[in-house]
Amino acid sequence: MIPRIRINRAWHRRGKRVAPALPAALLVGWTTATLPFFPAHWSAGIAFLAALLTVVGPRLGLAFALAVPVLPLGNIALGLAIVYGIAACAWFALFWARPRAALLFVAGPLLAPLGALGLFPLVAVAAGGPGRRAAQTAVGVLTAGIVAGIGGGTLPVTGGAAPNLAIGGIAAPATAASTLWDALTGSQAFLLETLALAGAAAAIGAARRRGPWGGAAFGAFLTVLTLFADAGASAPPLVLAAWLSAALIAVEPGIPRPLPEFFRRSRVRLRLVHGS
């Protein structure tokens, strides 16, 4: 019997209220410190304000955090700022019902240097339904690629050169969107891994609270999906992330759900073989 984790409800409520302030502060702090517009010493103050607004009101903090990058991006290219503004409004609408989970994609650039982007489907669980989980994961992985491109690093998961993001001075939104899309999808392997992880995030709900069988099924699914997406990807980090996810899913607290009929029949067959 695998032990289940018990969570103190009071601490859970406090954490649920305060935790979203961290990604808001990280998004605003990194944007204002990296992209030229605000004075250098303003970054910490604006990041703190984003965190404070998020604690006071999740939607207020989300709106502020998503709005701050518009000015630095407009300083680089007007078209880019317009494209981002449209995307930010769509993102705000998508997560209107779950504002505390709207900025989970910020975890992408944090997991990438650790070789742990394979854990993103697990991170995205808090986003809600399959569509939101897939969106968070896809944007998180793409954001990790953008950060790598700005920093002159290599693409996460697949390796290789990061995208060239030389889009300064573009005034037309359509041109800016096309240029950015071409840069992000220039590596087919990276795009396939992004889709694979997004698909795993969409499917993770089916494995939750089903005990070790659910965890094992998801671990196997994630392993196969990510390794088949790019045969040249580094296997050990992806496999480790898959089975760490499997272990955490296996001990997830909550009311257990019955296994699907396929798995129940598989267990019966395995027991018969073992006893024969």
Language model features by range: what are they?
Residues 1-12:
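Short, Lys/Arg-rich, polar N-terminal cytosolic tail immediately upstream
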Residues 13-67, 71-75, 79-82:
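Hydrophobic transmembrane alpha-helices
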Residues 27-35, 52, 123, 147, ...:
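Alpha-helical membrane-inserting segments
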Residues 45-56, 64-71, 88-95, 105-110, ...:
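Generic transmembrane alpha-helix motif of multi-pass integral membrane proteins
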Residues 63-70, 80-84, 99-111, 138-139, ...:
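Cytoplasmic-side transmembrane-helix entry/capping segments in multi-pass membrane proteins
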Residues 69-98, 111-112, 149-156:
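Interfacial aromatic-anchored transmembrane helix boundaries in multi-pass membrane proteins
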Residues 257-276:
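Short, highly charged, low-complexity non-transmembrane loops/tails of multi-pass membrane proteins
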